[in-house]
Each structure stands twice: as C-alpha cells, then as structure tokens.
Amino acid sequence: MNIYVRTNKFTAGPPAFVTQEDLLALRGARVLGVNPPVRDFAFMDLWSKPLGLLYLLQSLRAENSVALLDCVWEARAGLKTYGRQKTAKHEIEKPAPYAAVRRRYFHFGPAREEIAAKLAEMEAPDVILVTSVMTYWYLGVKWIIELLREIFPAAKIVLGGVYASLCPKHAARLGADYVVRGRAEPAAPYPAMDLYGAIDYGVSMTSFGCPFSCGYCASGILWPRYRRRSLAEALAEIDCQAALGARDIAFYDDALLLGKEEFFYPLCRELRARYGGGLRLHTPNGLHVRQIDERCAQTLAESDFKTIRLSLESIDPEIARESSGKVARGEYAAAVKNLRAAGYAPEDCETYILAGLPGQDIRSVKDTINFVWDNGGVPKLAEFSPIPGTPLFEAAARKLPALRSEPLLQNNSVYCSYFSHDITPAELQELKDMTKRRL
C-alpha cells in the first residue's frame, strides 16, 4: 500500500511543512536517515552525532525498515583522543558571501563519488530524512539533497534538524519535499546508535531545553519547555551505547548540574557501580560553575569526567546579564579552586569566553581572559554566532540586515571579524593569542 496515502501527509505537491508526529505515522516504509557533509572553514568532531535523527530512526524502526548514512562518520580519517575522529576534507570554492574572507573553505565529508557509490549499494528508500545542524552549514544540506534526488528520484525527501527549525522558510528552498517545522521531545528512549555498528563513543541528553534564557542561545526556541529525564531513562540510554562498545560518553545537556542532589549525584553513583571506571565522561557544552562546590568537583573526578568545560562567558556585568547572570567572579574562582583540589590540572578547566557580541568592548574580553588565567583556568574563546530568533540576533540584524536572509553570514568563524565590524581579524587573532600565552 502507498505509504504516502496512509499517512495523509506524504502526497505529491510543492514543499510543505510537517511535524514529528506526521513522521511517526509512517508504516511499512523503507526509511533512510542522512547526516549531510559539513561545508565550512573549520570543523571539529566534539563527539558529534545527529542525535535527533537517531532518536527518530529508533522510533520508526518498529513499523518500518531504517538505514543510516552519516557523511561525517563516513569521512573518519583516524582516531583522536577519547574516541573522537579526524574528519577527511577537501578544499572547495568559497560561496559568494565569503569572497572577502581570507581563509580556505572545505567540504568535510566523503567526495561525491564515494557517497554516490555508498548510496548505490542501498535498497531504494521510500522516505529520506535529512537532518541539519548549524544554519550556516546549509550548503552541505543542499548538496546532499541534490545528490539524493539524482540517485533516488522516487523517494520523498524530508528536511529536519536545527537549521530547519530556526530557518524554515529558507530551508523550504533547498529542494526537499517536506520540512519539519518545530521540535519535539524524542519518542524513543535512546538513539539508534547500533546503525553505526560498533562505536567508540556515545552521546546522551539527560534533559531537554534549559531553564535559563541567555540572549545569544537558541535552546529556549528549540526546546520551549525544560524537562529532566528520569534516572532510569538516562541510564538506559548510556547502557545501550556502552553495550555497543562505547567507552566515552559525551553529555549534550545545557544544564547537566542543575538539581545535582536529585539527579546528577545519583546518576554518577549508578554509573560507577555499573562500570567501575570503565566509562570516560565528557561535558563539551559547558558546566554552570555556580554548581561546582567541593562535593561536585570531587564527584566529577571520582566519576571519571575527563573533559570539563566551564561556562563563564564574561566578567563584564552587561554581558553577564545576557547570560542570565549564571555566574559571578567569586563563583568562578571557587569552582576552579574546587576542581584543582579534586585533582584536575589547569588545562582540564577550559573556560568558554564570549567574543564578538553586538556592542561588546574588546577590552572586556581581554579582562575576562586575564581573569581566567589569574584564577587557574584556561580560557577558550567562543566566537559569537547570531542565531535566528534570539534577542542578540535581532540586535545584530539591525546593524547587518542581510543576516535575516543569508544564513552564511551567521557563521561564528567569520561573523564577528568580517561582517559585524565590531572587531577586526587582527584583534580577534590577538584575543586568540592571549588564550594561549600561558600554556
């Protein structure tokens, strides 16, 4: 029977918007999930997996056959630390908006011929689910949609993910048949990581959304409601990936330590009991330093958290307000002191510092960098990316209206130093040099 008739959504016609609920109504379909290649000046595998797509494929597999093509994973080119992979790349022509940017531009992923050969080996799908992440990575999304259309002309292509949620009208122009509007909590208890076979690392979200409302962050747009998963749910997600061989787990949470007495400490106790140090844990998204007292720091160390990222953003009071006032100077100093006492080295206490925000004084960035050094941490520059729908995007777009129509201009690698005119490339390099000067 025609699956498109049965779902009452997947019918012929111009690009239309659908929801996750529409996709979950699929029955008897051959479904292919695709994570596109990345096109950008730089890309690093910080335990990067298309988690939303993997949750969806897990939900669909009970009533459909599912397969996965992860173009980033297919381009793995050697192991780095803690299960991460180097990603193969080749230089490509820069798109017109980047013509003045004096940097090389790359395709991170297999070449066209390699992906085409991989797709040719697959059974033709009925529905292809293409995910997306950064808004300024849409050229890789467009590229893979065109290739998929060429190889599987009869398949219906559905575009979802972060970019599609933040820029739905722009996403509707990339050639997909349908665009997923909005986000929803996963219907599956864990992601379909087994589609990779054996894995070196796993990923986990113990909560969805964030209780804070930072002016630069899209978490509240993507997840309007903050919800903490149960301890049993979080453990089941980690267990299923450890069973596939993962010895490293990266937490994607925006607020992992919130409510630590009720959730985080019990989670750590149970992981130690189950794995006895057999799992290494990582927090690439940054921890709220206000929560890191002596007990918390000791728990992190005892539970084998290897990658600690701290969220400071700025010691400038104006910038701190845009960060929901998550941290004060004394709280940061105390957090680093507690981590050092628990056995962490300075290089283990990398601290995110924002640079390039609308109206931000470069002197405040320098002051924050020096403050981190003076208190025993290691500064890590986080260049501002104007994300559609956030208050600071609106502030940036008033100065650069083209941000509203061209997502490439939202790229954090080049926005603040080439497009915002708030900071020059030379000044940005000076800030980067300051973050390395004491190592």
Protein language model annotation of sequence segments:
Residues N2-R27, R39-D40, V179-T206:
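N-terminal [4Fe-4S]-dependent radical SAM core
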Residues V38, L56-A75, R102-A192, G389:
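Glycine-rich beta-alpha loop elements in corrinoid/cobalamin-binding modules
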Residues R30, D126-L129, D248:
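Structural motif
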Residues G175-A176, A301-T307, D374-V378:
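Glycine-enriched alpha-helix->loop->beta-strand junction motifs that scaffold or abut catalytic
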Residues P168-R173, C296, P358-W373:
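Catalytic cores of alpha/beta
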Residues N2-A12, L32-F43, S48, L69, ...:
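C-terminal accessory regions of radical SAM enzymes
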Residues Y190-P346, E350, N370:
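Radical SAM [4Fe-4S] cluster-binding motif and immediate context
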Residues A75-E113:
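Charged, glycine/proline-rich intrinsically disordered loops and linkers
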